[in-house]
Amino acid sequence: MADPAFVPLRPIAIKDRSSIVFLQRGQLDVVDGAFVLIDQEGVRVQIPVGGLACLMLEPGTRITHAAIVLCARVGCLVIWVGERGTRLYAAGQPGGARADRLLFQARNALDETARLNVVREMYRRRFDDDPPARRSVDQLRGMEGVRVREIYRLLAKKYAVDWNARRYDHNDWDGADIPNRCLSAATACLYGLCEAAILAAGYAPAIGFLHRGKPQSFVYDVADLYKVETVVPTAFSIAAKIAAGKGDDSPPERQVRIACRDQFRKSGLLEKIIPDIEEILRAGGLEPPLDAPEAVDPVIPPEEPSGDDGHRG
């Protein structure tokens, strides 16, 4: 007989979660039913993964089978990254419970007219301006790049930051200047958050519209909608403080992460991402796919889902 005091682990909606936690140097495990980080002295720190959108695991972390199972049950995305979040090596997938969302995304991506409509809607939302008529996806991509470079230049001027161009090398992280390091750290935070939302909603990170051919193409598409009004100003702000000697003694990347976390919370970004994705895909002008006529319900009816549509719980 089931324990009446036992509460099944079920995902909660992305919009009700905190954003991102970076972890390093410790073992992640489940002890006494709690998700914990255990350091080399055996000190445990509890981490409420059920209330997080994403865990970023840096070098020096190990994770047990029980910890991964718990993250999967509560729908917390786990991403393995390089030191300071500079590389993405792998990601656990907490979503995948819905095929209709993925098929609708793929239908829009495969139809050239619908794809162009989606890209135009992204452009409109990103710059609050209608894109010129009769422009291809490649032309819009080029126009977008010009506008983004100008935004970077203006923000650098606003915050009095020395700025040459967006340059960084994954193999020589410390060789980059402080503004570029801050920007890379900030965008890594945004990418993790957007991927968690995409998976939670039942979409595929790899099926992009403006970006193509990358495992995170749609992540880049979605992140670009918010980048210049969220993490980019935050990165330049931190770079300016460091240049003026007003930052703390922690690495620039840590200062940026803390500032981005606070910015995500204040802006309510997690509440916006999934509804915005739905509206953008509807701009393609296609109808969502219907169930196949031969489709049948499972013999054992599934439990009423919790969380977002893509969560398995």
From Swiss-Prot:
Task: Name the UniProt key words of this record, in alphabetical order.
Answer: Antiviral defense, DNA-binding, Endonuclease, Hydrolase, Magnesium, Manganese, Metal-binding, Nuclease
Q: In which domain of life is the source organism classified?
A: Bacteria
**Its Enzyme Commission number?**
3.1.-.-
- Molecular function, one GO term: DNA endonuclease activity
Q: What does the entry list as the binding residues for Mn(2+)? A: 144, 211, 224
Q: Which residues form a coiled coil?
A: none
Names of required cofactors:
Mg(2+); Mn(2+)
Instruction: Using the UniProt annotation, give all residue ranges assigned to the region (Disordered).
Output: 288-313
Top class in the EC scheme? hydrolase
Example GO BP: maintenance of CRISPR repeat elements
Cross-referenced CDD domains: Cas1_I-E
Q: Which PANTHER family match?
A: CRISPR-ASSOCIATED ENDONUCLEASE CAS1, CRISPR-ASSOCIATED ENDONUCLEASE CAS1 1
Q: Subunit structure, per the record?
A: Homodimer, forms a heterotetramer with a Cas2 homodimer.
Main role? CRISPR (clustered regularly interspaced short palindromic repeat), is an adaptive immune system that provides protection against mobile genetic elements (viruses, transposable elements and conjugative plasmids). CRISPR clusters contain spacers, sequences complementary to antecedent mobile elements, and target invading nucleic acids. CRISPR clusters are transcribed and processed into CRISPR RNA (crRNA). Acts as a dsDNA endonuclease. Involved in the integration of spacer DNA into the CRISPR cassette.
Q: Do you know which NCBIfam families this protein is assigned to?
A: cas1, cas1_ECOLI
Protein family membership: Belongs to the CRISPR-associated endonuclease Cas1 family.
Protein name, entry field = CRISPR-associated endonuclease Cas1 1
Q: Which species is this UniProt entry from?
A: Rhodospirillum rubrum (strain ATCC 11170 / ATH 1.1.1 / DSM 467 / LMG 4362 / NCIMB 8255 / S1)
